[in-house]
Amino acid sequence: MTPQPLEQGGAVASFIPTGQEMAQRQNLIPLGRLIDFIIQRTYHELTVLAELLPRKTDMERKIEIYNFSASTRQLFIRLLALVKWANSASKVDKSAKIMAFLDKQSLLFMDTADMLSRMARETLVNARLPNFHIPAAVEILTTGTYSRLPSIIRERIVPPDPITTLEKRQTLQRLNQVIQHRLVTGNLLPQLRKFKIENGRVTFKVDHEFEVSLTVMGDGPNIPWRLLDIDILVEDKETGDGKALVHTLQVNYIHQLIQGRIVDSPDALAEVYNCLHYFCQSLQLEVLYTQTLRLMRDRLDDHIHVDEYIPGTKLTVSYWRELTNKDPKSELGYRLMIQTDQSDTTKQLAILHLPSIGTKEVDIADRAVRSELLSMERLLVHTVYVRSLARLGDLKTELQLFLKDVDYSIQGTPAMLLVPVLNPCLRAEHIYITVDTHTGMLRCHVPKHLDCPIMPELQHALNNDRSKLQHLFSELRYWITQRRCEKTLQHLPATTQERLPLVFPADHPIEKIGPHRVYIQMCRHANVILIVELKEKESSPNEMTYTFYLVLVKPSSMEDSQSVTAGGTSQSSAPSAATTESDGMPKMYLKVLSLIEFDTFVATHGPGTYVDEQTVGSKRKLLTGEGPSAKQSKTIYPAYFIPELAHVVAMCDEKLPFVALAKDLTRRKIPHGGVQVEANATSLVLKLLTLPQPKPPVIPVSSSAAAAAAAQSGPDQKPPEPKVVSVPKIDKDVWNALLKRLLSVSVRAQINKSIQTRMWTVELVFYGTPLASAHHKEQGMRRAVYLTYDMLPVDSVDKFVDMILNDWSKIVYLYTLVHDFREQIKNDKYNLHNIVTIKSYSYTSLLLAYGPNKEVNVNIYWDTEAKEFKMVFTGGNNAINAHSMMRDQLQAHLNHNYDLAQIVYLLHETYQPLSSIAKLPIIPHLAILQSPKIPVLSFCIIPQSPTLLRISFQGVYCLEVRLRGSGLCSIRDGAYSRFDRSHVVEEFTPTQGLKGFLSKYVDETAVYRRRSQSEDDNPPSPITMEDPHGGPASVGSTFLSGGAMRGPQSPRDPGLRFAAPLTPPSGSNPHTPASPHPQGIGGSQSHPNFNMTSPPAPHMPHPSPSGGLMPSSPLNPQPSPMAAHSPGPTNLPYMSGHTDSPFSAHSPAASNWPGSPGMPRPSPRPGQSPDHKAQKRLLIISLKFTAPHHNTSRVLPARSWAGAIPTLLTHEALDTLCRATIHPQKEIPGPELSPLERFLGSVFMRRQLQRIIHQEDNLTAITSNEPGVVLFKADNLQYQVFLNPNHMQSLHMKVSQAPMAPTMDGKPPYQWPPEDLQILEQFFDQRVAAPPYRPAVVTSFTRMLNLPSQVMKDFIQIMRLDLIPELGQGNKWNVQFILRMPPSATPIVPVGTTTILSHRQKILFFIQITRVPYLPNMELKDSVTMLLPMVYDMTVNHTQLAERREQIIPQLTSAVSAHLRRFVECTVLQPGECSLFPAVRDLLMNLTLPNEQPPPGQMGNQIGTMGGMAPGGPGGPGPMGGQIAPSPVGGQVVSSPNPMMHSPMQMGGGGQQSNYGGMVGGGAQSGVPGGPGAGGPN
């Protein structure tokens, strides 16, 4: 060990005496702890002072405070001195260590001297050296070993050599022989006969008690047995928790005890057995006793009791203590005794039962004790099971006395007695009788009916008075049968009731019905109740017989029941759930009207049931009838199902509707054949011999109208009669012809499998058909018509009969049309077979195909609710049937004339013009009105009669189209009144230039040729001559009749040649201030609620035809409700039925006219009487065209109402007007529109321009002598706007420099270059006056014209780049000038409004820039497009991006904003130069987006490339929520025929831009020439 220096205190410290070291340690304290003590003492004293001072006087407080401060000051001064001293304590420590070292050295010297002195005086005095062992040393040194150790060491340490395996085997075998000899020669107990000798020992095993091993230590006869091992086999597997019952110490004690006894015992083996047997029996009794106590504590409580326990001798347990207390037969009770045999202690434990049980059962119980599982619970369970079998056996014997021929069975554990009460009986319907294992009482239940109310009483009888069992079993049998009835009827339309409030007289036969009955209420028949009487068979009580009674009832009130019960009986237990109020009294009772008893055999063996079949073994049995009765072929039913009841209920439910139907038919005097069963018993059928002729429907008079009429007429007058609805007249020959074709009428009932409901099916079989159709199912001579109806309750059977008669009227009225039409279509003179094809005639509807290729259909049928004929138009390849818009007018015409031939001619002649008109787009548009969010229909078609309709354009202009014969139609301006052409209807505005526009499409050659051909082929007939002073007749004055063109005060148009009425007019039109009719005729007045703001309209509003017609849009969008802004058809009640009325007869249908009052529907103008024969009527309606009384000139008249004069056009010209085509000037881009829409749109834009000129202060209107030309002046420019004189389909502008005086400062006015003025003109032509026509575009353009010349000059430069993109060859971006706010722009101004705003020397405008493709294979549709709101500040001459501060600026927009700010900071402009166009030009040339890919030449110079630009188009990422692709550079936009493409309703984020509007639309943009059409332009 390396020595340590003394300064470190290593060695010296160990020599400090223990007491001194501890003393030094006790005198030391850490400085930190001392400071803590001082602070705690000070805080304590301060706390005590604060608590005590308030109780002292002022002087005492001062004294205490001074004493505290003085003591505390002194204490902390000491602490301060101590701390200062501790700063130099290192020197003191070093001195102390030196002194301690010196003290330890002196002590060391002193101790050494004392120890040496003690050794010299005490230890070394008696010290001696030992004698050396010379021999051992010599031996070790010479030989290297030592052999003289004592032998005891070897004996104690070195073990002897073990014996070999052979010696061991021989020894054990010899020992086995010795043991075997001793056992043979000795006295061995019978209980020890089970032993095994091996390995020199004998092992005795007594089952379930012990196992012991013994051996002998020699072969002498007197050598005692040696006890080797004891194993106690008694176990407690229930309460022992798997532990041994005997402790090891106990086993060792028994081992020593037995070993001591067998040493001196003559019979050692008997002594071993006796000791161990007694111990094991005592242990078994103790285990059983312990288990019994635990059973009592845990589960069985007081149900068992330990009566006596003698350890090692006896255990007595009693059970069924409740039965012992109640049963007088068991005074001693039920006990179980387990005891040892006192006479022979070698025997096992014995079990005694009180009362005693059979020997076999006793042996089984004894095995429970001697088994491996020693269990008192098991012993009790077995004993209770044996006792239960005995009790149930006794009960079975008693039940057999009154329940004979019943199959009893005792089974299960615990034991159960199964007693069937019915035959057949489900196992779950047996009475399960068992013994309560705890109490010994009998328990019973029916598993299927656990809630049976009879069970408690039956259980009480089983345990007490068994004389009531027979009665209770009978009641249970009835109760279960009632439940079977409920189960049987759960899927049938019937409910069971135990009681019903029936009211009947005292002597009524219903009282004879037994007490056990079931009331069955039919769900579908409230007036019928089925009573089922239940009886037991006398020969076999377990079988039931059923008797059925049908009871007719009616609801009865309390007063009715009292009147009945005054002399009778009321069997009511509870009020019925179905209570009705009549005369203020609730009807809670059911009065019995009649009672019918069913013959059960007849009811269950009628039609639809199986025939009894006899299984006969021999012919002799068949002849003599001997032997048992033949068995019916067994149909397997569940035991709970009562087939007789189900059959009777189903039969009643099936036949009662037929009975009620037959009764109602008899009441209506409709002959029928009664209820019959069809062949093969398939179903019931009710055949009607004939059906009555339909009666005209009557409109009942309302109570209020009747009261008002009675008040006006007085008490003596008759009440008003109900009004009869007009229906077709049924001639006798038509009726007879229909009845001849009607072969049979059958009524059947069926089940609708899909919805599981019953329904009526009425089959009408006709012979052939009057009209041969092309339908493949209508070719045979047997024509069946099937009518289906939901089966209503029996009390509503009259409604069902009414429905049959209504559908019969449907067939009859349609047959009246078909019967007349049959003769007309066969006549080749009328050429109807070439006009129309009969696709189907099913007696209920008629389907006709017409049109050029017979591709459109009309379905005609009689509507039983509306009491009129209905027409449904279908078909068409590209659009729906164009006649859908005229459906109401055509229906009214058909319901007035009842002539199919006229309808066919109307459909044939009007199909082509209506198909052309249907091509006009009826899509709603936004931003037309002052409120940009209100949609307005582009075209709204308003039918007024079968041959007259109005077409409204954007709710401003109106055209009136009249369809004429011979391929002609007339068009006039519908804004003018029909009476006074100088008067304008307030709803519309006259269309300026309409006459000139229409005259460009007049084909005079075709018009006159068709007139001459019509006159040559069909000369005027005296029958069809018109009154020269009359007006056009409804349809008769349109294209099928010749009419004269009247003057302005009586516009008379030729039309269909139908019969005209011959009565004078009775009033005038309240719409117009001037009317050609006298006001006083008949004293007629206008309707008080008539809307004076609307044009002439019928007094019944009718739905707009646009509701079902969208022919021009492939997308077929739903029409807008703005169709109501357009006027409806015109007609008044006095217009109909007069030849001299200037009105055309219009449809009596309803109108959607806003504010139109509801007035009586006018009747259409009648034609010839329907009594006339078809030949005369067709002569009247044959196609003729009479030459007009004046010629239509193409020269525009000088009158302002020139458009009010009709212009005749051919159908081809009308189709040209309405068909969408490209612009006549191909250099003007735009979508495909119809010429009519272009003309009206141009007129509309011109009118908007005129309105804006009058509103704006800076625009000065100039009077023009040319009609249709708008002149105005702005700043120093003069503008002229006019329609194209060639085609009148586009607006054009001419700009010229106006002569201006010098300015205030003497400078000449700015002279505009001709190139700038030309750009301005081209921009107006292609971007402003272009579709879609929006007022906001004109407003933006005119506001731009008001701006200063230097600003407008820059705007013109932007327009130049917009119109001619090729000028910016080096630009990275193309630009478009936006004039209308798109929905994808920043929400600065409302969508659809103007985009140029000037306020406080700041100008807001919008441009759209599109990235020029710069990568290989990059197309315009993949380019980025941004819509930028720009702000030009005229005060500071800065151009910036308009941004909203609260919004998060997109990355692309922020890049543009940063670029513009950089331009403002770095660019130096010329004096007086506007920064607007330079900023835009710099943006187009130098803007680079942060995520833009570099061109291919710069890819190598870039360290990392950014991600590719996301594709534009709808939904793509972009600055405004979507990227907008521009139009191709310098390319011609190929427009789309889809009218949806230019609808602002389709505008959305990501819409694309056309190259003629600068505005983002919602349609697809033409990415390349030939692509889809433009989006939403200006």
From Swiss-Prot:
Spell out the subcellular localization from the entry. Nucleus
Q: Mind telling me what this protein is named?
A: Mediator of RNA polymerase II transcription subunit 14
Instruction: Give a short account of what the protein does.
Output: Component of the Mediator complex, a coactivator involved in the regulated transcription of nearly all RNA polymerase II-dependent genes. Mediator functions as a bridge to convey information from gene-specific regulatory proteins to the basal RNA polymerase II transcription machinery. Mediator is recruited to promoters by direct interactions with regulatory proteins and serves as a scaffold for the assembly of a functional preinitiation complex with RNA polymerase II and the general transcription factors.
Record-level GO cellular component terms: core mediator complex; mediator complex
Chain span(s) of sequence motif LXXLL motif 2: 739-743
Subunit structure comment from the entry: Component of the Mediator complex.
| Major localization listed first in the record, in broad terms | nucleus
Here the segments flagged for biased composition (Pro residues) are 1095-1104, 1157-1167
GO terms in the biological process aspect are: regulation of transcription by RNA polymerase II
Pfam families, A to Z: Med14 (PF08638), Med14_C (PF25069), RM2_Med14 (PF22981), RM3_Med14 (PF25065), RM5_Med14 (PF25067), RM6_Med14 (PF22984), RM8_Med14 (PF22983)
Q: What does the record give under GO molecular function?
A: transcription coregulator activity
InterPro entries (alphabetical):
Med14_C, Med14_N, Med14_RM2, Med14_RM6, Med14_RM8, Mediator_Med14, RM3_Med14, RM5_Med14
Residue ranges of the region described as Disordered = 561-582, 1009-1173, 1510-1578
Task: Work out whether the entry's keyword set contains Protein biosynthesis.
Answer: no
Tell me the protein family, please.
Belongs to the Mediator complex subunit 14 family.
Which residue windows does the record flag with biased composition (Polar residues)?
Answer: 1084-1093
**What keywords tag this UniProt record?**
Activator, Nucleus, Repeat, Transcription, Transcription regulation
Where along the sequence does the record place the motif called LXXLL motif 1?
49-53
Query: Per UniProt, what is the name of the gene that codes for the protein in this document?
Result: MED14
**Record field: transmembrane:** none
